[in-house]
UniProtKB/Swiss-Prot annotation:
This is tRNA-specific 2-thiouridylase MnmA. Belongs to the MnmA/TRMU family. The lineage of its organism: Bacteria, Pseudomonadati, Thermodesulfobacteriota, Desulfuromonadia, Geobacterales. The active site is at 110 (nucleophile), 207 (cysteine persulfide intermediate). Its EC number is 2.8.1.13. The record marks 135, 345 as: Interaction with tRNA. One of its GO terms (molecular function) is tRNA-uridine 2-sulfurtransferase activity.
Amino acid sequence: MAEKHRQRIVIAMSGGVDSSVAAALLKEEGHEVIGISMQVWDYANFAAPEGEKFDTCCSLDDIHDARRVAEQIGIPFYVVNFEEEFRRLVIDDFVDEYFRGRTPNPCVRCNQRVKFELLLHKARELGADFLATGHYARRVRGEDGLYHLLRGLDPAKDQSYFLFTLTQDQLARTLFPLGEMTKEQVRRLAAERGLRVAEKGESQEICFVPDDDYVRFLEEERGTGLMAGEIVDRKGNVLGRHGGTYRYTVGQRRGLGIAHPTPLYVVGVDAERRQVIVGPAEELLATGLTATEVTWVVPPQGQTVEASCKIRYRHQPVPCTVAVRADGSAEVRFRQPEKSVTPGQAVVFYRDDEVLGGGWIEGRL
């Protein structure tokens, strides 16, 4: 590589195979690569069962793995402590949302407020030209001079849903080295290079709830016995009682403790009234949704956008019409009714492979 193309790049290293391969590839391309891991949560209070490890990211074991990979490929490595900021910007929001009767997505908030804000700022302090991550997503510069965010080439691993909040300035300073690869290719590259994390499993749980017990975590944060109340149907008929609205999410069927001739699902959570609203499966259907904090990767042309949208990560995109409002909100109408529109989750707008933007689901239509 010619010297003029050599860049200083900070790579966010989670200790997993993806960011490890991304770091190795950037180093092989001749760049000056600096590895950084984020310390965002104190795991001292969590002990995995003997002989087991939590399937999460950002643990001390993961940071140790990242450090060893950095040593193996020959790049400097640092740990930045964002515990205080992560608590304020991600965890407190997560807890608040549940106690408002919503179901949050902390991974999007982490990308928005920590990784592509605080860590990107840290990269700039180090004089880096770019921040690189192991996300399966693509970033291209169009003929219009603007940066466009695209799905990762591997449909099974595409993570563009979690990145819809990225701005033009952030995209201009971000690299996704794995965007054109499949997971199988990444593992093969790791094995070929003898990276010690080549066969490491993928993180499955939220980093600060490593045992996946949300109820325990929320009650430790706010106390037990809060938000208990009635389970009702759409007409207000009382069908039972519950131990806390934060224990329920739209679409949930198990754990209701109600004897009923037909299957019942959670169709709404009213935290203010401390009510969990249930109904048959057809009551989960919605013709659309309202969204707040709507942001656009590239500003839309006009007040109406024809797109496809995902209302949760593993949801297949569905055709929709987005009515853009001046206050930063939007009204989204589906072509066909969709199930389980969940307040607090992200709705992300696509056109083919391109991420147009997204927002946070406020309610259903």
